[in-house]
């Protein structure tokens, strides 16, 4: 950090574009612009021109190249046993 003074990549930086919500930080509570969706709901609400991050799932770790997050949940339903 030391290039532009108005380009701060912090958690809550309103220095983006007008009408664009702040970047969503993994592990942090969702912005107070919309009601927080229930766990397991994907909310791709990050719209930044030039860079569109993957959909964020509240309550889960960031996705890894299409690999399911290690939440300890098998691919089959719990009623499989």
From Swiss-Prot:
Highest taxon listed in the record's lineage: Eukaryota
Protein name: Uncharacterized protein DDB_G0276477
Organism: Dictyostelium discoideum (Social amoeba)
């Amino acid at each position: 950090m030391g290039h532009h003074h108005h380009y701060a990549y912090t958690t809550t930086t309103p220095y983006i574009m007008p009408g664009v919500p702040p970047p969503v930080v993994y592990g942090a509570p969702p912005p107070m612009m919309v009601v927080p969706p229930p766990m397991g709901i994907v909310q791709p609400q990050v719209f930044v021109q030039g860079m569109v991050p993957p959909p964020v799932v509240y309550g889960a770790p960031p996705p890894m190249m299409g690999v399911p997050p290690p939440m300890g949940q098998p691919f089959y339903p719990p009623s499989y046993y």
